[in-house]
């Protein structure tokens, strides 16, 4: 046990590597096509692309520039985005949201255990990781990793960009909270792979927002504080911006604090009120909770602009309609401790950056939750009356910055972005365990990345031939209070008295904030290295490959569903257009023989009845039915046009079309 626990004792310090900055513009320029920027949010996601000298934030198929990070399964299909969120109240157990709060975490994490009690879907333990169990079509139970669900959302953003750009997209910059740890970053990268994307770079959300703020800012050096309070996570980053150089001085945050927690407090308030007023406990009624969750979010948003809102829900329980007021003062009281909690990371980041309050030139607000007046007031008070800058769109700034970074990596940014340099930092201290369970720090928090540090250690026992390298992240002095990232053994060390062998341990953090560790016996040159895979936390390559295959199958199924709906719509459109054509006096009503009219009307009536009875027919069946109806109607219509001298098929005034194949709105 001693050998494993006390693998090393500090003999001499050899700091081989030093911090080095980097120019992202030079990297991977040749290989990449257009690189989109994706803000993969807890509650909403957003995608942008740099095009024609500026960033375009891309609207989805519903015309919205942000898409709910929700996925749902029904008996016949998979839904993503608005479609999933809109049916949540009637299908709560099969509707998944807030998956970013699970990604890269262990099942026993206290945050996961807490969230399990709050969501209507089922979270299960698989190999120590939280997986989501849900019924997919035909009542089949399936478990999905958080990476797979995130991949579905990333896939939706990829499709949105492809529809806008009219070409396939393979590369993306994906953002993560600055305070995400190694496992959470790696899991986000894996989600990209499952979605069929090469994640060219992971960048921190506040840094991306700082680019959105500072892209066109010329002039001297400025210190900015980015306050990023989103749906599920909270970050504070302090940066210096100087003519295109963005240098992060310090970062802090809470990866489990955001708008969802504020909604939850509203829900708890109303659950108590309903219990008291109606003697009814709805805390286990997923359908009622789904309706209440939706209204709580709506009320919270409304209270940013007004002082009172009425929460009204039809038939919330037992057919009872619910209607109660909620004031801004009550909302602030319910969330007072959570709002104040945001100030802790602000103070810590300021201390780490070594700046006085008066040295912050701008406070940039990012994330929908920064619209809350109380949050703005707390910031204003802390910075002694300084007004936060509201110049960036809090919902879109992160995707905007990611798109700029994408254009730098692809080389498509041109002169506008060629001088941009990002100097980001590692958010947490990284080190290894030395004798006595001590956390020996190799890379302190807020070190500029990418970075490389080496240190020489030695053996703790005589004749020791193997050392175990245990890698941790965290700020405490003992490893038991830090988070184990992974461990590996370096064996084959020649037997020698303790303190003789020299083992060089090298930590290298790449530009994504992901850690690689190498240990080398200086005597023999034998070495071992690992990319930290968070013990059980990381998906294996086989699992990722399987999930990629399944994601492709789902995409194929989604395509089939769309084709089926299109075929149905085509048949329906044809029938209604034809009905209109033969029934309208201005069209063909008066030109048809009664026998012809009867024949057409009979065929249309029969087709409509068939449609009613065959809601879930296959694409081929709809196409076959369309051919049948056309075979009856088209010859008759053509004959009429020939008799009257009109053009066959399209109707005299271009309507009534036989070939109308537009999608219905």
UniProtKB/Swiss-Prot annotation:
* Keyword Amino-acid biosynthesis listed: no
Alphabetized, the UniProt keywords read: ATP-binding, Chaperone, Endoplasmic reticulum, Glycoprotein, Nucleotide-binding, Signal, Stress response
Motif: Prevents secretion from ER; annotated at 662-665
A biological-process GO annotation:
protein refolding
An example of a Gene Ontology cellular component annotation for this protein is: endoplasmic reticulum chaperone complex
Which InterPro entries does this entry report, sorted A to Z? ATPase_NBD, BIP_NBD, Heat_shock_70_CS, HSP70_C_sf, HSP70_peptide-bd_sf, Hsp_70_fam
UniProt feature, compositional bias: Gly residues: 646-655
Q: Name one GO molecular function term.
A: ATP-dependent protein folding chaperone
Q: What else is known?
A: The kernels of the over-expressing transformant exhibit floury and shrunken features due to defects in seed storage proteins and starch synthesis.
Query: Quaternary form?
Result: Interacts with P58A, P58B and ERDJ3B.
Name of the protein this chain belongs to = Heat shock 70 kDa protein BIP1
Q: Which organism is it from?
A: Oryza sativa subsp. japonica
Instruction: Identify the coding gene.
Output: BIP1
């Amino acid at each position: 046990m001693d050998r494993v626990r006390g693998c090393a004792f500090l003999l001499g310090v050899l700091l081989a590597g030093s911090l080095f900055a980097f120019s992202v513009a030079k990297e991977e320029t040749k290989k990449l096509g257009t690189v989109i920027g994706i803000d993969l949010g807890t509650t909403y996601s957003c995608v942008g692309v740099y095009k024609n000298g500026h960033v375009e934030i891309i609207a989805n198929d519903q015309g919205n520039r942000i898409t709910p990070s929700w996925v749902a399964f029904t008996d016949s299909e998979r839904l993503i985005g608005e479609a999933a969120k809109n049916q949540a109240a009637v299908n709560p157990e099969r509707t998944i949201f807030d998956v970013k709060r699970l990604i890269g975490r262990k099942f026993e994490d206290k945050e996961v255990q807490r969230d399990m009690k709050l969501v209507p879907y089922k979270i299960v333990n698989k190999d120590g990781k939280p997986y989501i169990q849900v019924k997919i079509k035909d009542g089949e139970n399936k478990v999905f990793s958080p990476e797979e669900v995130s991949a579905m959302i990333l896939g939706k953003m990829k499709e949105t960009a492809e529809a806008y750009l009219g070409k396939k997209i393979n590369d993306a910059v994906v953002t993560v909270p600055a305070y995400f740890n190694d496992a959470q970053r790696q899991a986000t990268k894996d989600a990209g792979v499952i979605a069929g994307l090469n994640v060219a770079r992971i960048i921190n959300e506040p840094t991306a927002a700082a680019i959105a703020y500072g892209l066109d800012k010329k002039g001297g050096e400025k210190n900015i504080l980015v306050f990023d309070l989103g749906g599920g996570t909270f970050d504070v980053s302090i940066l210096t911006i100087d003519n295109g150089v963005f240098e992060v001085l310090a970062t802090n945050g809470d990866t489990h604090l955001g708008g969802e927690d504020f909604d939850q407090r509203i829900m708890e308030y109303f659950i108590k009120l309903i219990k008291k007023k109606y003697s009814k406990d709805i805390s286990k009624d997923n359908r009622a909770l789904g309706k209440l969750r939706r209204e709580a979010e709506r009320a919270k948003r409304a209270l940013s602009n007004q002082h009172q809102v009425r929460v009204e829900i039809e038939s919330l329980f037992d057919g009872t309609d619910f209607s109660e007021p909620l004031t801004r003062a009550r909302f602030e009281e319910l969330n007072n401790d959570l709002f104040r909690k945001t100030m802790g990371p602000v103070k810590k980041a300021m201390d780490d950056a070594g700046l006085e309050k008066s040295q912050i030139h701008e406070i940039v607000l990012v994330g929908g939750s920064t619209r809350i007046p109380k949050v703005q007031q707390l910031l204003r008070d802390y910075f002694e009356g300084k007004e936060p800058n509201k110049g960036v769109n809090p919902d879109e700034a992160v995707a905007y910055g990611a798109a700029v970074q994408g254009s730098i990596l692809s080389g498509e940014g041109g002169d506008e972005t060629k001088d941009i340099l990002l100097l980001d930092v590692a958010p947490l201290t990284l080190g290894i365990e030395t004798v006595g369970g001590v956390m020996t720090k190799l890379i302190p928090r807020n070190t500029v990345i990418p970075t490389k540090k080496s240190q020489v250690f030695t053996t703790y026992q005589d004749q020791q031939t193997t050392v175990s390298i245990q890698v941790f992240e965290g700020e405490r002095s003992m490893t038991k209070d830090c988070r184990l990232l992974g461990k590996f053994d370096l064996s084959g060390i020649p037997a020698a008295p303790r303190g003789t062998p020299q083992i060089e341990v090298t930590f290298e953090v790449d530009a994504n904030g992901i850690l690689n560790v190498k240990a080398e016996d200086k005597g023999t040159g034998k070495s071992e290295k690992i990319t930290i895979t968070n013990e059980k936390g990381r998906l294996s390559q086989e699992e990722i490959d399987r999930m990629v295959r399944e994601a492709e199958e789902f995409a194929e199924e989604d395509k089939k569903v769309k084709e089926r709906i299109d075929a149905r719509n085509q048949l329906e459109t044809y029938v209604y257009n034809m009905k209109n054509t033969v029934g309208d006096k201005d069209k063909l009503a008066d030109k048809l023989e009664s026998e012809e009219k009867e024949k057409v009307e009979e065929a249309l009536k029969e087709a409509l009845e068939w449609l009613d009875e065959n809601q879930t027919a296959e694409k081929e069946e709809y196409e076959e039915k369309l051919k049948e109806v056309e075979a009856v109607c088209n010859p008759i219509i053509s004959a009429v046009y020939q008799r009257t001298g009109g053009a066959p098929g399209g109707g005299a005034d271009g309507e009534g079309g036989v070939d109308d194949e537009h999608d219905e709105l």
